[in-house]
Amino acid sequence: MFAILADPIGGGFAASIAHPGGNITGFAALDSALGGKWVSLLKEIAPRTVRLALLFNPVTSSPLQFYMPIIQVAASSLGIDISAAPVRTKDDFESAISGQARSSGAGLIVMPDVFNVRNRDLIISLAARYRVPAIYFNAPYFARSGGLITYSDDYIEKCRLAAGYIDRILKGGQTR
């Protein structure tokens, strides 16, 4: 039983979302459709956006690989160019975000990653300082820290649902 697993299929834990196989059940944390929504929301709040950088940790690049196809489709349909902005250390954030600010029409998508969550206050303050509109993946953390806009699954609700699954499993019931 997993409450929130980033990519159960890509991680080899489940055969598919509809039919995971084996003795596993739970809730996936990644939904590729979110990538397209991040692009469209950012374009809606910053209509002059023509360039988006995807801020990601190359050590755990699976979120970038997971979301990139849908982000590229959405960006292309809105006339937006996409680039990757890898951040390996805390010091990399300033150069990545200030680099986006060097020309007009820039925006930033902060990709799902624990490294980005841990450094959210720095990321949010740099985006504000350099006036780069940014959208963040984890609503509870980034919204409470002052992020411009967030859009993600409701992780708290997923944990509540997982608790219900665990209760049923421990009582001998099925999760379907």
Q: Residue locations for each model-derived region?
A:
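Short hydrophobic alpha-helices and adjacent helix-cap/hinge residues
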Residues: 1-176
